[in-house]
Swiss-Prot record:
Residue ranges crossing the lipid bilayer per the database entry: none
Protein name: Large ribosomal subunit protein uL14
Record's subunit section: Part of the 50S ribosomal subunit. Forms a cluster with proteins L3 and L19. In the 70S ribosome, L14 and L19 interact and together make contacts with the 16S rRNA in bridges B5 and B8.
Keyword Isomerase: no
Main function: Binds to 23S rRNA. Forms part of two intersubunit bridges in the 70S ribosome.
Species: Lachnoclostridium phytofermentans (strain ATCC 700394 / DSM 18823 / ISDg)
GO BP terms in the entry: translation
Length: 122
């Protein structure tokens, strides 16, 4: 469950290392983001020579949360960290690699490129 001011790790090679959530997309009263939701975030830490720089405002999709997500069969999927992938306006990732596992819920929300690049889909 991600909200405004939450910090997330970046799970791609776009150059950013840490994000600060500014806004959850989807209406003015929307408070929390779960797996597969889009957020607006600020880059708080970045590697030199990356595509994105520290201070850039980017859109990202949440791929892992500590809170997890409930599935239709009643099971839950949870992760050890909150992580996101920086995306372009066409919902494709800015980076060319995805690090760590991603949840199956991303496939249902049409983030096919992220799912295909991920090393593991849980």
């Amino acid at each position: 469950m991600i909200q405004s001011e939450s910090r997330l790790k970046v799970a791609d090679n776009s150059g950013a290392k840490e994000l600060l959530c500014i806004r959850v997309m989807g209406g003015s009263t929307r408070r929390y983001a779960n797996i597969g939701d889009i957020i607006v975030a600020s880059v708080k830490d970045a590697t030199p020579g990356g595509v994105v720089k520290k201070g850039d405002v980017v859109k990202a999709v949440v791929v892992r949360t500590v809170k997890g997500a409930r599935r239709k069969d009643g099971s839950y999927i949870r992760f050890d960290e909150n992580a996101a992938v920086i995306i372009k306006d066409d919902k494709n990732p800015k980076g060319t690699r995805i690090f760590g596992p991603v949840a199956r819920e991303l496939r249902e929300k049409q983030f096919m490129k992220i799912v295909s690049l991920a090393p593991e889909v849980l």
